[in-house]
């Protein structure tokens, strides 16, 4: 049975939705969890500690171990303080789940510097700084699990939306970071993977049937990636409606012109072979 007894987890953005489901499941299976959430509104403004507090209360009432953290992780310092909170309160850090995100439905032509900066801070910089702060402790322990969050809206052309340019940027950047950290942490027992979830959260912004797209149907996949039983890195696990699959990239056989320098016309003539379709 997969358990997390004696382990410590941070789940960013875990006051609601997917993050809350992850935090509850990890705590139910023995982990001590830092429930991180500043309780901001959909537009990223405001502050409400009750959002994280409610999940902590739910966990502790059920007999689990959890503490809230309200740090603003849009800066390196905030990320460092979040990691330090887990270590100072529980003495170690085993699991980092980079779940916090932000969506702005803004086409390329309408993107502003302020909007792009916020996307970069939350979707790219925060996972980077949090991982940087967590790495020394995980290396010292010779154990760690880091999970990033990506999206089919970024990975696949057929699911892309023109108003999600910034969102797609952030979600693909996390996959590059996943691969680099998977190599960096391999010798020290640090495994790094990603989840690509679809769930009915406030960010989805569309109505679904009550029994569809529940965050609880995604959480088991994240729990596996966070466990000792998951001893691989570089996996992108797609999860929705209790359906789980891995997203994989393949390189076509292509053509090989040897030492010759071929023409663009030759590329055009053999395009179907190069693309494999």
Question: Which positions does each model-derived feature cover?
Answer:
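Substrate-binding pocket helix/loop in short-chain dehydrogenase/reductase
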Residues: 107-108, 115-117, 166
């Amino acid at each position: 049975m997969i358990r997390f007894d004696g382990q410590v987890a941070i789940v960013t953005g875990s006051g609601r939705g997917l993050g809350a489901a992850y935090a509850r499941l990890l705590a139910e299976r023995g982990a001590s969890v830092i429930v991180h959430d500043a309780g901001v509104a959909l537009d990223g403004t405001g502050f409400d500690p009750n959002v994280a507090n409610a999940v902590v209360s739910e966990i502790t009432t059920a007999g689990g171990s959890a503490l809230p953290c309200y740090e603003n992780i849009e800066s390196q310092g905030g990320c460092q303080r979040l990691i330090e909170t887990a270590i100072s309160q529980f003495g170690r850090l085993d699991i980092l789940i980079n779940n916090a995100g932000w969506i702005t439905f803004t086409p390329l032509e309408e993107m502003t510097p302020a909007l792009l900066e916020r996307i970069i801070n939350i979707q790219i910089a925060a996972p980077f700084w949090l991982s940087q702060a967590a790495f020394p402790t995980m290396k010292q322990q010779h154990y760690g699990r880091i999970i990033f969050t990506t999206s089919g809206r970024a990975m696949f052309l057929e699911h892309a939306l023109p108003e999600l340019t910034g969102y797609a940027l952030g979600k693909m950047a996390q996959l590059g970071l996943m691969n680099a950290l998977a190599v960096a942490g391999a010798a020290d027992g640090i495994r790094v993977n990603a989840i690509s979830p679809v769930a009915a959260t406030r960010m989805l912004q569309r109505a679904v049937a009550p029994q569809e797209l529940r965050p609880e149907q995604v959480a088991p996949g994240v729990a596996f990636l966070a466990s000792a039983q998951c001893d691989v890195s570089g996996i992108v696990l797609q999860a929705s409606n209790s359906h789980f699959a891995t997203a994989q990239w393949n390189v076509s056989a292509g053509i090989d012109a040897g030492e010759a320098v071929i023409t663009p016309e030759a590329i055009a003539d053999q395009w179907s072979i190069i693309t494999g379709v």
